[in-house]
Amino acid sequence: MLQSYCIQGFKSIKNATEVDLKKTQYQTLEKTNVCNGILKGCMFVGANASGKTNLIEPLRFLLMALFAVREMKWKNFLCLFSDADMFENTYRFLIDNAEIEYTIRYQNTDKLLVERLVLDGKVMMERTGATAKSKITEKKVFNGIPNEGLFLRDLWFNTRFRGHEVLQKWFDFLRASQYVNMETGLMMSFGEDQSLRIEKYIEEHGINEINQFLDECGFSFHLIHHPERNAGETGFGNLTVKRDGIMLEIPM
């Protein structure tokens, strides 16, 4: 699970800012919202343009750089309000009671990309510019690394971290992640065969759980699925909404 992350000079976050998901002594939701001492989720509350979106952007950035985009335009993530001309993101995870820390730092002045992977206090990989040292692979020193991509991404694609079970489980966890932005409608899956489209979910699970959720939350309508109809490009073509007490079904 994600334990914490610290960002500096990234997007609108000028100063070092840490988001810590380790639980405190608050016990009201401990049975359902805490796992192994870490919160399962959190919510950011603040005024418009206060930086809420950019606080979670580092998570999408990490997943994009590892699984989706091979050549990143690092300078696009620099904070416009900072004179440092660099950003640094550090992510900490707890996987099978092992602590993993991964840092990405980009210095725009020298076009220098730095990566550092630490497992339970032991440096497993360290990259500075085009050179890297690794304890994950048989080959210990690498040269000529392209500046546009993460070296950790290449290590995983080439080795799948053979012989390092904790790192394998860490990447399985990351690849199971999904990004949903309800404001822009952007949805992203980073693993294989992970579709966020509603027709795939209904095909596999039906609509009973969805309607049960609507009942539990006190909504006065239900979904009706018409499998004989074409779902269409939106995925909603074979779904209708029926309000309680009204015979008419409304297409979604």
Report the location of each language-model feature:
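Short polybasic amphipathic segments
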Residues: 87-92, 112-121, 232-246
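Short, mixed charged/polar active-site loops
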Residues: 14-16, 99-101, 247-249
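Beta-strand secondary-structure signal
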Residues: 4, 18, 88-92, 101-103, ...
